[in-house]
Structures are given as structure tokens and as C-alpha cells.
Swiss-Prot record:
Function: Binds to 23S rRNA. Forms part of two intersubunit bridges in the 70S ribosome.
Gene that encodes the chain: rplN
PROSITE patterns to which the protein is assigned, alphabetical: RIBOSOMAL_L14
HAMAP family (UniProt xref): Ribosomal_uL14 (MF_01367)
Key word rRNA-binding present: yes
Name of protein: Large ribosomal subunit protein uL14
Any single Gene Ontology cellular-component annotation: cytosolic large ribosomal subunit
Database matches in InterPro entries: Ribosomal_uL14, Ribosomal_uL14_bac-type, Ribosomal_uL14_CS, Ribosomal_uL14_sf
Any GO molecular function: large ribosomal subunit rRNA binding
Subunit architecture: Part of the 50S ribosomal subunit. Forms a cluster with proteins L3 and L19. In the 70S ribosome, L14 and L19 interact and together make contacts with the 16S rRNA in bridges B5 and B8.
GO annotation, biological process: translation
Amino acid sequence: MIQQETRLRVGDNTGAKELLCIRVLGGSYRRYASVGDIIVASVKEATPGGVVKKGDVVKAVVVRTRKPIKRPDGSYIRFSENAAVIINEQKNPKGTRIFGPVARELRDRDFMKIISLAPEVL
């Protein structure tokens, strides 16, 4: 459950390390984002020489949340951190690698490129 001012780890190799959620996209008064939702975020921490710099405003898709996600079969999945992957306007990842596991719910939202790059899909 991601909302404004939430800080997230970055799960790709764009050079950003931490993001701050500015806005949850989808509806005029939408408050929370979960796995597979797109957010607008500011880069708060970045490595030198990366694709994105500190202070850049980017779009990102949430790939892991600490809030448990209920699945249709009744099971829940929860991760140890909140993480997002920076995407471009075509909803493809800006980076070339994805770090850490991602949730299966991304497949339903048509983020197939992220699914294929991820080392593990839970």
C-alpha cells in the first residue's frame, strides 16, 4: 500500500536507489497503490553515472509491497520491502536488469518485459 510521501527502493539498474512517491495514477482522488500500479515519483538517492539523476521526476510501477496482497485462491503474498521499477512512457522498464523477486500480479497488468527480466516471479 503506497501513498504520497512513501519512500520506495528501486528494483532496477537505472542508477536510482530510492524514490519518493509524489502521486498515485488512476483516478482523481486515488490514495493507495499496490503491486502493478503506476506512480509518479521523485528520485531521492542515486548513484553517479546512472540513467536518472537525483531530483528527476519519473514514472514507476510498484513491484513489491510490505502490505500483504490477497490472491484469488485465498493465499496472501507479502515482501520485506516496498520497491518499484522505473518505466518510460511505453510502460517498458528504463533499466536493463531487474533485481529481486516480483509479484505475479504484474502479468495481469501487461508488464511482460519486467516479468521476463525478473530473476524470480512469486
